[in-house]
Design a protein with these regions (language model features):
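Intrinsic structural disorder/low-complexity segments
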Residues: 11-13, 36, 63, 67
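Histidine-centered nuclease catalytic patch
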Residues: 20-56, 69
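Extended charged
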Residues: 19-27, 74-116
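Contiguous alpha-helical segments
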Residues: 1-30
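Extended interaction regions within the primary functional domain
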Residues: 1, 34, 60
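N-terminal functional modules and adjacent low-complexity/disordered segments of proteins
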Residues: 14-15, 45, 73-75
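Short Cys/His-centered divalent metal-binding micro-motifs
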Residues: 51-83
Length: 116
């Protein structure tokens, strides 16, 4: 996924700080979901949408810790970003179909989740 980064500012951050590692690089960066996975799963957003490169950003580990599970973008803005994504993404057509399904009211459900 690191090779899918097209934003120059984020590429510079990656080059300057490197990838976070608990043993070798505590000052590194990590990949973060702009629209959080937690919000996505709570709202029934399809995983294919959440993993799209347009939903990823590079953050310092400390920034990510302070962000926790909050989203920095609305679902509508994420859909706009994905629909206008100019990079190459192997799942682009699939994700556009999932967005259309979501906009028509269909939601992802975790068939493995048990309600005890």
């Amino acid at each position: 996924m690191w090779d899918l980064i097209i934003d120059q500012t984020q590429l510079l951050k990656l080059k300057e700080f490197g990838i976070f590692n608990t043993k070798t690089n505590l000052n590194g960066v990590i990949r973060d979901h702009i629209y959080s996975r937690r919000n996505g799963f709570d709202q029934g957003v399809f995983p294919e949408i959440l993993r799209h490169p347009a939903n990823c950003q590079i953050l310092h580990c400390k920034e990510n810790a302070s962000k926790r599970s909050s989203s920095w973008i609305s679902i509508e803005d994420l859909f706009f970003k994905i629909k206008n994504y100019s990079g190459l993404w192997v799942e682009q057509e699939l994700v556009l179909d999932k967005i259309s399904q979501y906009e028509q009211g269909k939601r992802w459900t975790n068939e493995y989740r048990t309600n005890n």
